[in-house]
Swiss-Prot record:
Gene: ezrA
Protein name: Septation ring formation regulator EzrA
Source organism of the structure: Streptococcus gordonii (strain Challis / ATCC 35105 / BCRC 15272 / CH1 / DL1 / V288)
Principal location class: membrane
Spans traversing the lipid bilayer: 8-26
Membrane topology field: Single-pass membrane protein
Length: 574
């Protein structure tokens, strides 16, 4: 045997040994993997999913929750019956491949099994999460059902405890309670029979009906109490009060009070129908309307009661007030008669007094009629109050008119005295002004002064003549006095101006002598001013001529003389 053959045999033997060792190692590794996969499968299979499914199933889910549960339950059934069986078969098949040293197929099978287990693990996790969510949701739903039942039971107890306070509404309330009870029964039937969607709809409606009926039950007693007790009691008191007022002699402007009482009774009776039908908004509206009508009647009665008190006070006070205004009128008439002997009065005052007297007589008739009939009132006190208040207001106006007229009459004699005093003063002023002008030794008196003086004298003479009449016309006196006052004022002003211009002109003419000898313009102005002064007696123009000429050669000279004159001017001493 050659060395080459020996080496070949050794190589082959070594290769076989190595192959065997490798096969043993691979087989062992695959067995380990398969054991691990088997263990994972068993853990998944042993999870308490069945218990969780049964727990949810026993909750009697409704609506969408039940639909969702069925979907996840079916998924779990598929997993437990099919997926786990497939995994088990695949593991068995992989073990066969591994035991027969078909390692490639075994490896492929192991990878496939691992993928299957991963998918199953993910699906189980999703199923369990979904079941947990359903459990939470069902807890809420169960609480919802229990809450609805609790509300319903409380409502039943509340109504049963005191049916009387619900009045005619109790029958309809009990009927609706029975309807809600029927809805609960229908809900249970549908939920048990596997119609969750319809059952959920019924539960929604039932909850809404419970809430609506609860609101009604809470609202009805107050409406019933108002309609059954409050409003009838008010109406009874109102009718009783009305009868007493009528017996006491009260009358009313409104003639339909009895029919309004009847209508109120009818409205109260009819409103029970709204309550019986649970038309609570209508019932509340009708209660409000009834209350407003009762208030309106109450206002009518209180108006007349208040008016009666006012009428009594007016009947007590107006006669004295009327007497007072009549006395005022008599006094005015006496004053008119007295003054008419001394003064020419306009017909307006006399007519006014006569008109007031006639009106007072008419008002007296109204007052006396109400006072005499006070023991037997024949009309509503509010109408009597209106008439007496109008009378009182008119008496106040008449009194104001009497005061105004009295002041006018009183002013006649005051105006007469004032005119007599002032006419003497003005006569004295005329004499004083005349002497004042004479003392000035002027070359002549200006026409403006003479015109004002003679006008003032004539007006003063006219005023004296009017005041000396047997019956003085005081209106003419006041007019003449106003004219004389203005005349004296104008004359006094004119006098001061004439004297001022004359004095200043004389001073400036004398002052101009210092310039006349060498200034031709001053000489000419001097001659012109002197001519106007001595021949025309226009002292203001004369002053303007000489002052303008001097201002050219000596600016400010005029104002210096004017200022000096004003400081030393002699006033007219009246």
């Amino acid at each position: 045997m050659s060395n080459g053959l020996i080496i070949l045999i050794i190589v082959i033997a070594v290769a076989l040994i190595l192959a065997y060792v490798a096969a043993v190692v691979l087989r062992k590794r695959n067995e380990t993997l398969l054991d691990s996969l088997e263990e994972r499968k068993e853990k998944l299979y042993n999870l308490p999913v069945n218990d969780e499914v049964e727990a949810i199933k026993n909750m009697h889910l409704i609506g969408q929750s039940q639909v969702t549960f069925r979907e996840w339950n079916q998924k779990w059934v598929d997993l437990s019956l099919n997926s786990f069986a497939d995994i088990e078969n695949n593991i068995f098949e992989a073990e066969g491949y591994n035991n027969s040293f078909r390692f490639l197929k075994a490896k492929h099978a192991i990878d496939s099994i691992e993928s299957q287990i991963n998918l199953v693990e993910e699906d189980i996790e999703l199923i369990r999460e979904a079941l947990a969510d359903l459990e939470k949701q069902e807890a809420k739903n169960s609480g919802r059902v229990l809450h609805a039942l609790e509300l319903f039971e409380n409502l039943q107890v509340k109504v049963a405890e005191d049916t009387e306070k619900y009045g005619p509404a109790v029958q309809e309330i009990q009927k609706q309670l029975q309807n809600i009870e029927s809805e609960f029964s229908q809900f249970v039937t549908l939920n048990s029979s596997g119609d969750p969607v319809e059952a959920a709809d019924i539960l929604d409606k039932t909850e809404n009906h419970i809430l609506a009926l609860t609101h009604i039950v809470d609202k009805v007693p107050s409406i019933v109490t108002e309609l059954r007790e409050v409003l009838p009691d008010q109406l009874e008191d109102l009718e009783s009060g009305y009868r007493k007022l009528v017996e006491a002699g009260y009358h009313f402007v409104e003639t339909d009070i009895e029919s309004r009482f009847s209508q109120l009774h009818s409205n109260i009776t009819q409103n029970y129908e709204n309550i019986a039908a649970l038309e609570l908004d209508n019932a509340q509206y009708e209660n409000t309307q009834i209350q407003e009508e009762i208030n309106a009647l109450y206002d009518i009665f209180t108006r007349e009661i208040a008016a009666q008190k006012v009428v009594e006070k007016l009947q007590e006070n107006l006669p004295a007030y009327l007497k007072h205004t009549k006395e005022n009128n008599q006094h005015l008439q006496s004053e008119l008669d007295r003054l008419s002997k001394m003064y020419l009065l306009s017909d307006e005052e006399d007519e006014k007094v006569r008109d007031l007297q006639s009106e007072l007589s008419a008002l007296e008739a109204v007052v006396l009629a109400t006072v005499e009939d006070s023991a037997e009132n024949k009309q509503a006190y509010s109408l009597t109050q209106e008439a007496l208040e109008a009378t009182q207001e008119r008496l106040k106006e008449i009194e104001d008119e009497q005061i105004t007229l009295g002041e006018r009459l009183e002013r006649i004699e005051k105006d007469d005295d004032n005119a007599r005093q002032k006419v003497n003063i003005y006569i004295n002023k005329l004499h004083t002004i005349k002497r004042y002008m004479e003392k000035r030794n002027l070359p002549g008196i200006p026409k403006s002064f003479l015109s004002l003086f003679f006008t003032a004298s004539d007006h003063t003479e006219a005023l004296l003549t009017e005041l000396e009449q047997l019956r003085v016309n005081i209106d003419n006196v006041n007019l003449l006095l106003e004219n004389v006052t203005n005349d004296i004022h104008d004359l006094e002003t004119e006098t001061y101006q004439i004297v001022q211009y004359a004095t200043l002109t004389e001073q400036l003419l004398q002052y101009s002598n210092r310039y006349r000898s060498f200034d031709q313009s001053i000489q000419e102005a001097f001659n012109k001013a002197l001519d106007i002064f001595e021949n025309q007696f226009d002292y203001e123009s004369s002053f303007e001529v000489i002052s303008q000429a001097l201002e050219v050669v000596e600016p400010g000279v005029t104002s210096r003389f004017v200022t000096s004159y004003e400081k030393t001017r002699e006033n007219i001493r009246f």
